[in-house]
Amino acid sequence: QGDIPVIVDPKAECIQWFQPDVIVDAILAKRNLGTKITDAPFVIGVGPGFTAGEDCNCVVETKRGHTLGNVIWDGSAIPNTGVPGNVGGYSIERLIKASADGVIEPKAVIGDLVRKGQIVAITGGEPVYALMDGIVRGMLQPGVQVTKGLKIGDIDARAKQEHCRTISDKARAIGGGVLDAVCSYEKSRGKYALILLAAGQSVRFGSDKLKAVVEGEAMYESA
């Protein structure tokens, strides 16, 4: 019916009974939380923390820049710098971080326009202030337990509400890299051959070079 099934499975126990052909670890924790190259016939790690050939078959780059979305078949993605990419002239200011340990109580929701210095959330009873003007692009749900300094949301200086309901350029590039990797895997499983036809008059092989005998056999014979 075209519906996408979603399973809440923190320990990924469904891998044991579902036995998928492909696993994509897109947790984006900046480190491997337990994914193994033996979990499925083809395992993709997204972002830093994975090494192709060791804990996964390939890695997809997630850092903004020229290599965003690239499929890495040998080695790892660019290490996490802890500094978010520049969007609209802002970097670290884009992040909304918990001001204290405790439960989060959002004061702004995705799509809200906020001003620098505005309270956008309460964490552990302490206010969290926006560090820039813009639109809220991400925010954790109410009641989530957080720790001081944890990223709980982000702000976009471009301030376009439609961006909150569409796939971002970064997400599209990363998704494209995953798709490219899966397609490469599918091709490797099948039996493929490339035939380059170059029939025609030839000084060396005569009127039909595909039928010319080389080392006792015709270069090409139809089935």
Regions found by a protein language model. Give the residues of each.
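N-terminal glycine-rich phosphate-binding loop and ensuing alpha1 helix
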Residues: 192-223
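Well-ordered secondary-structure scaffolds
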Residues: 1-189
